[in-house]
A protein has these predicted regions:
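Iron-sulfur-associated redox domains of electron-transfer enzymes in respiratory
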Residues: 1-166
């Protein structure tokens, strides 16, 4: 058999994790927009749900995203001290800690849930966080909970509506 006729082993397709991003309207969502307007390259394997404040993100929202097939969830808000609603991001920390304990009880790895502060001017930071989170989830593999994938949220859709729709 000649060298030309040797067939290469078929390449295994790369698995792309599904991420749900809950983003504060005033900072994190604007940071994602800055990344897009600036044409900063990042991986596209996430669905954005815009909320008015990161303090509004209840554990049930995150758990529903996992239930509907998300491999990871990113909660993002204004930097501490820069919250449009003054103390919303402090409330987000409290909610995040509650959510983290429930996720742990479900047997999911802590690395599937992430909290980040991203300002409107930090488009490059948003892109870097998305890329890092996707690589972290690739190392963990698919979520052991459910196989369904989460669709995108419609513009102006409330978080409850976006999650209930899936």
């Amino acid at each position: 058999m000649s060298a030309r006729k040797k067939s290469a082993a078929p390449k295994k397709p790369v698995w792309d994790p599904s991420i749900v991003v809950f983003a504060c309207n005033w900072c994190s969502y604007a940071g994602a927009d800055t990344a897009g307007v600036s044409r900063i390259q990042h991986q596209p394997h996430f669905r954005m749900i815009r909320v008015m404040c990161s303090g509004r993100i209840q554990p049930g929202f995150v758990l529903r995203a996992f239930e509907k097939g998300a491999d990871g969830v990113l909660v993002s808000g204004c930097h501490l001290g820069d919250c449009h609603y003054q103390f919303g991001n402090e409330k987000a920390i409290e909610q995040f800690d509650k959510t983290k304990s429930v996720v742990k009880m479900l047997g999911l790895e802590e690395g599937r849930l992430r909290l980040e502060w991203i300002s409107a001017a930090e488009g490059a930071r948003f892109a870097r966080i998305i890329d890092e989170f996707i690589e972290q989830l690739r190392a963990l593999g698919p979520s052991p909970l459910f196989a369904d994938k989460v669709p995108a949220a419609a513009p102006g859709e409330e978080p409850e509506e976006a999650i209930a729709r899936v």
